Structures are given as C-alpha cells and as structure tokens.
Curated annotation (Swiss-Prot):
InterPro entries: Arginosuc_syn_C, Arginosuc_syn_N, Arginosuc_synth, Arginosuc_synth_CS, Arginosuc_synth_type_1_subfam, AS_cat/multimer_dom_body, Rossmann-like_a/b/a_fold. GO terms for biological process: argininosuccinate metabolic process; L-arginine biosynthetic process; urea cycle. One of its GO terms (molecular function) is argininosuccinate synthase activity. Homotetramer. It comes from Thiobacillus denitrificans (strain ATCC 25259 / T1). It holds the Pfam family Arginosuc_syn_C. Pathway: Amino-acid biosynthesis; L-arginine biosynthesis; L-arginine from L-ornithine and carbamoyl phosphate: step 2/3. This is Argininosuccinate synthase. L-aspartate binds at residues 122, 126-127. Gene3D superfamilies: Argininosuccinate synthetase, chain A, domain 2, HUPs, Single helix bin. Keywords: Amino-acid biosynthesis, Arginine biosynthesis, ATP-binding, Cytoplasm, Ligase, Nucleotide-binding. L-citrulline binds at residues 90, 95, 126, 130, 182, 191, 267, 279. SUPFAM superfamilies: Adenine nucleotide alpha hydrolases-like, Argininosuccinate synthetase, C-terminal domain.
Length: 409
C-alpha cells in the first residue's frame, strides 16, 4: 500500500494526462487533485473541468487558474530584462513557463494537504527536470510521481489501448495517428517537435505554423509601432497603457501579422541529447529587439557589457530548470538593479519577418549626449587632444610586448 494518499496532477485534459489521471487512481489508489493552468495557450479550458468530473474528481479539487498576468509580469518580463537567449537563438518560451507551474502545484499541495505532485513530462525531455527542480526548491520533502518513468505504456498504441479499456474518451485525431507534432503553447510562444521534424535536414512544412504568416505573404506595407518602457518593462503600445499579458498578446498579434518570430533550431537538451524544434515567438522577438534598443541609450557601457557577459549563464539556468535556485535569484537582483533607469520609448518598423529599430528616446535617462557625440562644432564639450594620451596609455602594454618580441628575434 502506497503512503501517497493525495496527488496534485498537472492536468491539461488531453489524452496523455487523462490516462495519467486514471493510472494514478488505479496504481496508487489515491485521491487526485487536478490543476490546469491558463498561460494564454489559446485553448478552451472548461473541457478539462468536465473530464476531471467524469473521473470522479470532486469539484472543489479541480483547479483551473488564469495565470496569464503573473506569467508575463513575474516570469517573462524579468527574463527579457536580461535580453535572455539560449544558445544564440531560443527565447525560452517553454522553459520560462515551468517554474510558474511548479510554484502553483506546490501552492495547491499546501492548500489541500496533498503528499505528492504528478506531471506528464517524458523521461527524455527537459520538462521533467524543470518541474521537479522547481518543486523541490519550493517544498524539499514533496514526493514526485513521473508516470513516463514508471509505467510500461511507452508507445502510442499501448496508451490508446489503456484509454480504450478504461473508458477514456479518445478524440478522432488520436485514432488517426494523433497530431503531426508535439506542441506546447503559452503567451510567449508555440513550439513544434516530433514526426518529420526529427530529421534535422527536412524543412518544416508551411502549414505547420499557426501564429505567423509566411514572411513572403506578409503585408507589403510596413507597420510602425512605439513601445513605452518603465524600469525595463513595456507598459504601453502606441501610448495605450495595458497590463503585461495584454502587451504580449498585442505584440504577438502584430508580429504574427508581419511574419515575425519563426525559428527552426537544433538545441542541446540538459539531459544530454540534441533536439530539433520549431518555434513561433512573434511578441518575444519584438520585445528582445526593443529592449536592447532602449538599453542602448540608458545603460552605462560597462553595465551593458557585464549584462551581456552574464546572460548566457542566466539563460542556461532558466533552460535547465534553475529558476528557483539561489544563483538565478542573485543574478535577478543584479539585472533588476540595472533596469532602474531603463525608461523611454522605442519606435519600430515591422516588415516581412523583420523588426527594425527606427528610433529610441528617453527624456530623463538618456546617456546619449549629442553635444559630445556630434560631428559638428561641439563648442569645447570634448577636447580631441585628450584622445592622444588615452590611446598611448592603452597601447603601452602592446608596445612593451612588441619591443620584447623584437629583441627575441
């Protein structure tokens, strides 16, 4: 008899997690609490409630939470303050959602007195690591059930057979072979993996993309937008203030319309393998370009360079599941400190897959001094004679080394 009496399941309402729900009831003879997160994935979530009820889950044990604002405000925006990119390209759309889901799972564990959490991540991927590192960081003694590491339902056929034998409804798409891709979506991105994408030499089919038009089919006329920044975060689009999640949703709409944000990537998973995935991150692509633009006039040079030096480590921490680790929190304090004066506006041109910065301004925090930088008469603001001594001092070590090399010959 298991000592696990109550489990909080991260539940989508789809086939896999519905099978997991029934499997938990049968294998552990335990009470199941379901948790479904609305992260802006664009799916109707009420069916998840109805399916949970069909499994005998009590209404008060079904959690369907709208986390869109918290997701963007407390996770996506802090990440973009660092200009975060993993391996030069990936904007971490899946990675950044997992710590919030882990946090909410633990909150529900504490609220319901559950013994364990359960997730549907496979034993091959990064998500199992992200969910579990987050859970252990927030509740060290929590138990974790990962069915894909325990059961023998390791093929689509076995999963379907289990569902059929236990009366779990099977959508027609699953009977016909399922979705052609494994997809994950939230307000920041949508990802595609599996099937023919497992051949890294094969081009993704055009009808795969859901959020963006092909750049070739994007409007022939460019569209200009203005983003307003306060302490490193976008607070308004074209002068209209809006909550964080509405900012990202609007940028997704604008970017998708203009074919912005497509990515085909082979990435290095934390568990050791290489994986090919395709991503659409229209709003995030705009955010990254705009944030670097506003920082270009408001950040000190050495602070900006320090941020760039630290960014790959920060990105790896998020990708690998260490959002709740002390080193990520420490880096966040530094990053947030640098954003105190990142205020102003950025004007962008959106055109056929491109985000083009056409202007940036900060009334009170710009370090750009036109009286010094001008090519015209600066009225003595900058004494060009000073540059000679500056250059000689910086060249000193190289001159000494060159003289030594000459003597060695």
């Amino acid at each position: 008899m298991s000592d696990i009496k109550k489990v909080v399941l991260a539940y989508s309402g789809g086939l896999d997690t519905s099978v997991i729900l029934k499997w938990l009831q049968d294998t552990y003879q335990c009470e199941v609490v379901t948790f479904t997160a609305d992260l802006g994935q664009g799916e109707e979530l009420e069916p998840a409630r109805q399916k949970a009820l069909q499994f005998g889950i009590k209404p008060e044990q079904i959690y369907i939470d709208d986390l869109r604002e918290e997701f963007v405000r407390d996770f996506v925006f802090p990440m973009f303050r660092a200009n975060t990119v993993y391996e030069g390209e990936y904007l971490l759309g899946t990675s950044i959602a997992r710590p919030l889901i882990a946090k909410r799972l633990i909150e529900i564990v504490n609220a319901t007195g559950a013994d364990a959490i359960c997730h549907g991540a496979t034993g091959k991927g990064n998500d199992q690591v992200r969910f579990e590192l987050g859970a252990y960081a927030l509740k060290p003694d929590v138990k974790v059930i990962a069915p894909w590491r325990e059961w023998d339902l390791l093929s689509r056929e076995k999963l379907l057979a289990y569902a059929e034998s236990h009366g779990i409804p099977i959508d027609m798409k699953h009977r016909q072979g399922g979705s052609p891709y494994s997809m994950d979506a939230n307000l920041l991105h949508i990802s595609y993996e599996g099937r023919h994408l497992e051949d890294p030499s094969a081009e993704a089919e055009e009808d795969m993309w859901r959020w963006t038009v092909s750049p070739e089919k994007a409007p022939d006329a460019a569209e200009y937008i203005e983003l307003t920044y306060a302490k490193g975060d976008v607070v308004a689009i074209d002068g209209q203030q809006m909550p964080a999640h509405e900012v990202l949703a609007k940028l997704n709409e604008l970017g998708g319309k203009h074919g912005i944000g497509r990515l085909d990537l082979v990435e290095n998973r934390y568990v050791g393998m290489k994986s090919r995935g395709c991503y659409e991150t229209p709003g995030g692509t705009i955010l990254l370009k705009a944030h670097r633009a506003i920082e270009s006039i408001t950040l000190d040079r050495e602070v900006a360079h320090l941020k760039d030096d630290l960014m790959p480590r920060y990105a790896s921490l998020i990708y690998n599941g260490y959002w709740w680790a002390p080193e990520r929190r420490a880096l966040q304090v530094l990053i947030d400190h640098t954003q105190a004066h990142v205020n102003g506006t950025v004007r962008l041109k959106l055109y056929k897959g491109n985000v083009i910065v056409v202007g940036r301004d900060s009334k009170n925090d710009s370090l750009f001094d036109s009286t010094i930088a001008t090519f015209e008469d600066d009225a003595g603001a900058y004494d060009q004679k000073d540059a000679g001594g500056f250059i000689k001092l910086n060249a000193l070590r190289m001159r000494i080394a060159a003289k030594l090399d000459a003597r060695r010959k």
